[in-house]
């Protein structure tokens, strides 16, 4: 009844009329859409400018602190660490992120001032600036660096929109013309070995690894062997037993604990405890299976569902956590195991602003120093990672601890920051007040303690110089090996020089 139009295309004039009609009804460009895009571009440029101004302000703070203290380059926590701590606390970010800002700030001031000006004016993005800094990091000659900075500042604003990979390649071409040994090169695949863990929100984690083939197959065989140690009545699938065998292998166990529940299980005794310990904090009611409250792995964001906590409790070593209440201070400097366990479980992480170092890897710090009469007491103890412990001790930070574990920090610049124990949301009973303590007899001066600062074996500048030298040495070896291979393959005359491959200035 109807003629088929399959395979037939309407004439161009018909398509044009339809497009025109559709555009009149649903115009693609309107004053409203144009204004919205203008706002998007304006705010993106403002974002770039703000990133540049942030680096500039960090650079001014850096200059101020260097003028006040010098580099303190042999100190274990040097001036760089001290400045990073101030920035991290002020911006509520990690020490590592603050250190990254400081690194790019120094690069903008000392190595790439002209490219940095493009960032401050909003002409390039912060991510583009990061790429340029990384791709030029192996240049070790000041004049070459200045020439590359000039060349990139002229080019980068005219380059079209690029992915990070294409931008890196474009920067590499400029670097190669100035200093072939400074071009970033990909290492061999063996160097990309890695092992990563992503924590999920359901008490499970995902694991990804890139290993030597021999190691990977050894792990595979070991998992199969451990999975086979459970009896035939074990309710888990093979893949579930292999997954559980990872934990048994990490604990150094020789057998996988069977879950058949039979008194005469043929699988043998439970595996012996190993050297690897994962600390999980949970309410007793959760351990007993009588409450839905989750548990928490100390030092992570992982929450363990209540049913999994109860299941783990059947095969784990349990240690009750005792709240000290109004107990008197302990004698001596080192807290008892009971008190130390309480402080670590109350705090869960380092108590410096923005730090998430696990409490199990942190020092126990006397807020009021023991030498000034500070008691070994829950109201005067908190967890600090080694880096922030040294920063507090030697870089002019002041702290006050309240009986509920709250710590009030005052930076060398006078800013105030407040941190609460990590257990405050999950286990508020651990934050019940532990009693008042007497104020310190006197405050000692930071200058009197500087002689006790641990020293570095190599300064930050020496580490950077070695890093650059190693990278350049690798690049030179790769280039020379490639040239030798090309000469061996084609022993004829060398090709003419590329006219664009001259030295700077370009």
Model-derived regions: residue spans:
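Conserved helix-loop functional segments at active or binding sites
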Residues: 67, 349-352, 390, 397
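Rieske [2Fe-2S] iron-sulfur domain-containing proteins
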Residues: 1-332, 417, 431-436, 441-506
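Structured core elements
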Residues: 196, 206-208, 279-281, 342, ...
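Short, cysteine/histidine-rich loop/knuckle motifs that typically chelate Zn2+
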Residues: 260-264, 349-354, 387
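Short, well-ordered secondary-structure "scaffold" segments embedded in the functional core
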Residues: 391, 404, 431-434
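Histidine-centered divalent metal-coordination motifs
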Residues: 366, 388-389
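Histidine-centered nuclease catalytic patch
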Residues: 323-344, 353-383, 394-408, 413
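A short, sequence-level motif marking secondary-structure junctions
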Residues: 421-427
């Amino acid at each position: 009844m109807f003629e088929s139009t399959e395979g037939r295309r309407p004439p161009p004039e018909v398509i044009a009329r339809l497009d025109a009609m559709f555009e009149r009804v649903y115009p693609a460009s309107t004053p409203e859409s144009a204004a919205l895009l203008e706002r998007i571009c304006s705010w993106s440029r403002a974002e770039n400018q703000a990133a540049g101004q942030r680096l500039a302000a960090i650079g001014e703070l850096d200059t101020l602190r260097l003028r006040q203290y010098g580099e303190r380059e042999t100190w274990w926590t040097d001036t760089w660490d001290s400045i990073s701590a101030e920035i991290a606390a002020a911006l509520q970010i990690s020490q590592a992120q603050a250190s990254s800002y400081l690194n790019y700030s120094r690069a903008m001031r000392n190595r790439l001032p002209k490219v940095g000006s493009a960032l401050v004016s909003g002409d390039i993005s912060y991510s583009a600036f990061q790429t340029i800094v990384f791709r030029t990091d192996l240049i070790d000659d000041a004049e070459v660096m200045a020439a590359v900075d000039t060349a990139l500042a002229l080019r980068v604003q005219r380059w079209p929109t690029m992915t990070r990979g294409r931008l890196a390649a474009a920067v590499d071409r400029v670097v190669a013309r100035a200093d072939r040994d400074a071009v970033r090169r990909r290492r061999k695949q063996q160097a990309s070995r890695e092992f990563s863990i992503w924590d999920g929100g359901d008490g499970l984690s995902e694991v990804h690894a890139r290993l030597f083939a021999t190691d990977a197959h050894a792990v595979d065989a070991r998992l199969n062997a451990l999975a086979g140690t459970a009896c035939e009545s074990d309710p888990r699938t093979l893949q579930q037993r292999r997954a559980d065998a990872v934990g048994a292998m990490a604990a150094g166990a020789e057998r996988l604990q069977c879950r058949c529940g039979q008194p005469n299980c043929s699988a043998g005794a439970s595996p012996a405890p190993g050297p690897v310990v994962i600390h999980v904090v949970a309410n007793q009611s959760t351990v007993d299976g009588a409450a839905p409250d989750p548990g928490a792995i100390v030092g992570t964001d992982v929450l363990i569902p209540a049913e999994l906590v109860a299941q783990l409790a059947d095969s784990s070593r349990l240690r009750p956590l005792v709240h000290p209440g109004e107990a008197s201070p302990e004698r001596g400097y080192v807290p008892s195991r009971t008190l130390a366990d309480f402080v670590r479980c109350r705090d869960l992480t380092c108590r410096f602003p923005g730090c998430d170092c696990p409490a199990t890897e942190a020092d126990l710090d006397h807020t009021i120093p023991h030498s000034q009469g500070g008691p070994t007491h829950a109201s005067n103890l908190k967890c600090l990672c080694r880096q922030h412990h040294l920063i507090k001790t030697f870089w002019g930070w002041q702290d006050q601890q309240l009986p509920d574990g709250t710590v009030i920090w005052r930076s060398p610049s006078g800013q105030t920051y407040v941190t609460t124990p990590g257990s405050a949301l999950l286990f508020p009973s651990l934050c019940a007040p532990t009693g008042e303590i007497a104020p310190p007899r006197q405050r000692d001066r930071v200058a009197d303690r500087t002689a006790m600062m641990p020293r570095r074996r190599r300064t930050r500048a020496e580490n950077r110089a070695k890093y650059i030298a190693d990278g350049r040495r690798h690049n030179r070896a790769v280039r020379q090996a490639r040239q030798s291979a090309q000469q061996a393959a084609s022993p004829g005359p060398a090709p003419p020089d590329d006219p664009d491959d001259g030295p700077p200035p370009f």
